[in-house]
Swiss-Prot record:
Keyword field contains Ubl conjugation: no
Protein's job: Has a role in meiosis.
Positions of transmembrane segments: 18-38, 95-115
Listed name of the protein: Meiotically up-regulated gene 124 protein
Alphabetically ordered keywords of this record: Meiosis, Membrane, Transmembrane, Transmembrane helix
The keyword Iron appears for this protein: no
Length: 145
């Protein structure tokens, strides 16, 4: 009975995160198309927030359904690796499109690739340690059994 209730919670949370991902992606796209300058302050603020939230939503979906994570097998190393890959992709998009994608990191380390990479890695570890950006308990940090 408990397993069935955990499964229904995971399904409901997955649906919620998919909806959040779609909304954040659409907001990001509208901002990208409608903003006259990709270097304007409103563009940076909105894209930082929406792209970061979209990444977090996708990673929560991965965490909820990852068999390693659900069984508690190598959850830290496997899931941090997935998180690191996702943020690395965001960094590559940053260089390709010349706009700030992942979070607030670009504002603090605009020109130093190594500092940016280190900051993203520590930020991903912080998310996995138990809290997301709003201070809520992260689904990724606690394996469901």
């Amino acid at each position: 009975m408990r397993l069935q209730s955990l499964s229904s919670v995971a399904i409901a949370e997955t649906r919620r995160q998919i909806i959040l991902t779609i909304i954040n992606s659409l907001v990001y796209l509208v901002n990208f198309i409608s903003c006259p300058s990709i270097h304007s302050i409103p563009f940076h603020i909105s894209t930082h927030l929406t792209s970061c939230q979209a990444n977090i939503s996708l990673l929560k979906i991965v965490g909820l359904h990852c068999p390693f994570h659900r069984r508690g097998i190598a959850s830290l190393s496997v899931c941090v690796a997935l998180h690191w890959i996702a943020f690395s992709c965001s960094v590559m998009c940053h260089f390709a499109w010349s706009c700030a994608l992942p979070c607030f990191v670009d504002s603090f380390f605009p020109s130093n690739f190594f500092l940016r990479t280190y900051a993203l890695f520590t930020f991903s570890l912080q998310l996995w340690s138990g809290n997301d950006l709003q201070g809520n308990h992260s689904y990724l940090a606690t394996p469901t059994r």
